[in-house]
Amino acid sequence: MTDSRIDFRQAKFLISAPDIAHLDEHLPGDVGVEIAFAGRSNAGKSSALNQLTEQKNLARTSKTPGRTQLINVFALDEHRRLVDLPGYGFAQVPLAMKKKWQQALGQYLQERACLSGLVVLMDIRHPLKDLDMQMIEWAVDCDIPVLALLTKCDKLAQSARMKTVNDVRKALADFGDGVKVEPFSSLKGTGKPKVLGILNEWCHPDWLVEALADAEQE
């Protein structure tokens, strides 16, 4: 059996779009596999993407949380993409803009058929805010698997880190096996192998594996 692991270091910028409608205009239809990354504006989403892909500037980090307003799409190969959704919930962003972003996020989760998994990034020191829970609930309602990624785990001692991880797992237990919880550090790479394993699994849904196998036989 050949190694089917995806090399996330091969991620390349594909497009930016202001909302789901424009995303549909730029992509070749709602096909293939997409894995989306969402989180509050100070959750370290861009840094996590850069660490996972081992690229310093794949996702641009900003000194001003909430600045990233676009949906940014990165191609892993011709069938698979990573989607960096706009950060949500930052206090200094105007209310009208917040509502626009939240509408776009909800629309994407509920309408994008090729969405194979959602990573919800949360600062481990401030997990499970209202909007985080809303994102998780939206995804679960749409039968989309979720990874609740507790970022900046290097900021806590090991005992405090594991307590928070266990507390979050208990809080999300009612969602069942569709929601996983893992600690992560963009600075030190803590948790990276486990996260990449989950993402790789999402990159290989049965229907895509079967379609690619059929294509090879033709």
Swiss-Prot record:
| Segments forming domain EngB-type G | 31-205
Q: Which domain of life is it from?
A: Bacteria
Keyword tags: Cell cycle, Cell division, GTP-binding, Magnesium, Metal-binding, Nucleotide-binding, Septation
Question: Per the entry, which co-factors are needed?
Answer: Mg(2+)
Q: Which residues participate in GTP binding?
A: 39-46, 66-70, 84-87, 151-154, 184-186
Q: One GO biological process from the UniProt record?
A: division septum assembly
Q: What is an example of a GO molecular function annotated in this UniProt entry?
A: GTP binding
Q: Which InterPro entries match?
A: G_ENGB_dom, GTP-bd, GTP-bd_ribosome_bio_YsxC, P-loop_NTPase
Q: Which GO terms describe its cellular component?
A: cytosol
Q: Which Pfam families match?
A: MMR_HSR1
Which residues bind Mg(2+) per the record? S46, T68
Family from the record:
Belongs to the TRAFAC class TrmE-Era-EngA-EngB-Septin-like GTPase superfamily. EngB GTPase family.
What's this protein's function?
Answer: Necessary for normal cell division and for the maintenance of normal septation.
Family annotation (PANTHER family): ENGB-TYPE G DOMAIN-CONTAINING PROTEIN, MSS1/TRME-RELATED GTP-BINDING PROTEIN
Protein's recorded name: Probable GTP-binding protein EngB
Q: What is the source species?
A: Shewanella loihica (strain ATCC BAA-1088 / PV-4)
Q: State which gene encodes it.
A: engB
